[in-house]
From Swiss-Prot:
The sequence shown here is a non-stomach isozyme. Its EC number is 3.2.1.17. The active site is at E35, D53. It is an enzyme of class 3 (hydrolase). SUPFAM superfamilies: Lysozyme-like (SSF53955). Residues 1-130 form the C-type lysozyme domain. This is Lysozyme C, kidney isozyme.
Length: 130
């Protein structure tokens, strides 16, 4: 599923993402935009450690989920990676919350550091009534 911008903003707000661990809704929206273009079915293979990033937040199989093919995978979210590709983003949101509960928080995502950190993010939630 490819979310419309405001549809995703409202959905993330409903899931309690706005202000979770001090991270504003606009930051989550910016992250999702640059990681997946709001697409729940996005995947990206990393040849370096043979891991894959999954879903709307591009959550990595080395640390967070199990895809059955990543060497030395940890599966800290205790889910199959396929769960991160569903139209229903409940499990993706729960796992993203787990990711940012670690000390580095949202800085775990390279795309956030590259495109969202220290930027004006108002456009990501503008006009969405959130």
């Amino acid at each position: 599923k490819v979310f419309e911008r405001c549809e995703l903003a409202r959905t993330l707000k409903r899931f309690g993402m706005d202000g979770f661990r001090g991270i504003s809704l606009a930051n989550w929206m910016c992250l999702a935009r640059w990681e997946s273009s709001y697409n729940t079915q996005a995947t990206n293979y990393n040849s370096g450690d043979r891991s894959t990033d999954y879903g709307i937040f591009q959550i990595n199989s080395h640390w967070w989920c199990n895809d059955g093919k990543t060497p030395g995978a940890v599966n800290a979210c205790h889910i199959p990676c396929s769960a991160l590709l569903q139209d229903d983003i409940t499990q993706a949101v729960a796992c993203a919350k787990r990711v940012v509960s670690d000390p580095q928080g949202i800085r775990a995502w390279v795309a956030w550091r590259s495109h969202c950190q220290n930027q004006d993010l108002t456009s990501y939630i503008q006009g969405c009534g959130v």
